[in-house]
């Protein structure tokens, strides 16, 4: 029997504790879980891709079956095929997330009907955490330590120093 391989993607700009929770839970469902940082190289992100990748790798270091990969200018289904993933993992906080994800699921299924999508609901303590919310708090100098993993906080601090 072949390994169960999943792919969880996002921009992770920055990664939040909500992302971490979904990844930890998804890692128990698969033999191998790839966490794909998808980014637009022509768009200035909050954190450079190198910082995001390094922060994610540190935050996920305790999960032996999880590997962080970065991609740009590629469709998620193409990355999934390349990595041998047969399942996409998505996190849902609310009905708006479901509606947003449903359109992607439609296109992904049209492009590759053998790749399934599973949805993991956010835990109540993470329902209102978002990367954009964290960026907004940072913009106004607020403490974000309770919203992001320590390794991400370190990357943000290091980036601010430069």
Swiss-Prot record:
The keyword Nucleotidyltransferase applies. The keyword Nucleotide-binding applies. This is Phosphopantetheine adenylyltransferase. Its EC number is 2.7.7.3. Its cofactor is Mg(2+). Substrate binds at residues 11, 43, 76, 90. It is found in: Cytoplasm. One of its GO terms (biological process) is coenzyme A biosynthetic process. SUPFAM superfamilies: Nucleotidylyl transferase. ATP binds at residues 11-12, 19, 91-93, 101, 126-132. It catalyses: (R)-4'-phosphopantetheine + ATP + H(+) = 3'-dephospho-CoA + diphosphate. GO terms for cellular component: cytoplasm. Pathway: Cofactor biosynthesis; coenzyme A biosynthesis; CoA from (R)-pantothenate: step 4/5. Reversibly transfers an adenylyl group from ATP to 4'-phosphopantetheine, yielding dephospho-CoA (dPCoA) and pyrophosphate. PPAT is a validated novel target for antibacterial therapy against Gram-positive bacteria. Is inhibited by a series of cycloalkyl pyrimidines, which also show suppression of bacterial growth. Homohexamer. Belongs to the bacterial CoaD family. GO terms for molecular function: ATP binding; pantetheine-phosphate adenylyltransferase activity. The record marks 19 as: Transition state stabilizer. It comes from Streptococcus pneumoniae (strain ATCC BAA-255 / R6). InterPro entries: Cyt_trans-like, PPAT, Rossmann-like_a/b/a_fold. The gene is coaD. Keywords: ATP-binding, Coenzyme A biosynthesis, Cytoplasm, Magnesium, Nucleotide-binding, Nucleotidyltransferase, Transferase. It is an enzyme of class 2 (transferase).
């Amino acid at each position: 029997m072949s390994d169960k391989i999943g792919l969880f993607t996002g921009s992770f700009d920055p990664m939040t504790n909500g992302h971490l929770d979904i990844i930890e839970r998804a890692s128990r469902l698969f033999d191998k879980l790839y966490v794909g940082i998808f980014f637009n190289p022509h768009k200035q992100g909050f954190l450079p891709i190198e910082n995001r990748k390094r922060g994610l790798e540190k935050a996920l270091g305790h999960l032996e079956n999880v590997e962080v990969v970065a991609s740009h200018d590629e469709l998620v289904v193409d990355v999934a095929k390349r990595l041998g993933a047969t399942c996409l993992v998505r996190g849902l906080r609310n009905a708006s997330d479901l509606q947003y994800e449903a359109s992607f699921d439609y296109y992904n299924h049209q492009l590759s009907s053998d790749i399934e999508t599973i949805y993991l609901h956010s835990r109540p303590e993470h329902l209102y955490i978002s990367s954009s919310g964290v960026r907004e708090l940072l913009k106004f100098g607020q403490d974000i330590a309770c919203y992001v993993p320590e390794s991400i906080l370190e990357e943000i601090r290091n980036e601010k120093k430069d």
